[in-house]
Amino acid sequence: MERKFRVSAGAIIIRGDEILLVRAKNSDGNDFLVGPGGGVESDEGINQACIREVREETGIEIRPYKILFVEDLVWQNKRVVKIWFLCNVIGGELTRTQGAIEEGLIEARWFRKDQLKNEIVFPAVIIGYNWGSFIEDNWKTQYLGIENSAFDL
């Protein structure tokens, strides 16, 4: 079986003690939270894809400035390598955009860590970290290994 392969960009956006996440549904109809992001188009860089996807899904303008994680996901006949960037907000206004509606996203909003206790969150690794540590200069990019995706890629 031939696998479809794609590269994707995701945004980790921290504001004080909050993180910006979007709520989506998987193919089973269960909802989950994930950092905004999506596939890289053939004519753009990974950082440009991150900027575009965040704008399309949230209305927020960002600047990616550090790679935090590299995620390697498998789902049926698909494989996605996702680069997670730490991003600064530089403009825009959080809104439910037309792009988000078309993608089936339910909401985009800021969450405190205590609000995520009973939620399914991707990348799951972010729950275990002090989000302030992402900003530190000595942060080393982490490869998260190959995982089966919990949702359709």
What are these regions (language model features)?
Residues 1-19, 70:
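Conserved N-terminal beta-strand and adjoining loop/helix that marks the start
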Residues 18-56:
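Conserved Nudix-box catalytic region and its N-terminal flanking loop in Nudix hydrolases
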Residues 6, 14, 28, 35, ...:
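Short connector loops at helix/strand junctions that flank enzyme active sites
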Residues 40-63, 73-122, 151-153:
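Unchanged
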Residues 128-153:
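Charged phosphate-binding loop/patch that engages nucleotide di/tri-phosphates or the phosphate backbone
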Residues 2, 121-124:
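A beta-strand edge to alpha-helix "cap/lid" segment located at domain peripheries
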Residues 65-69:
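Conserved S-adenosyl-L-methionine
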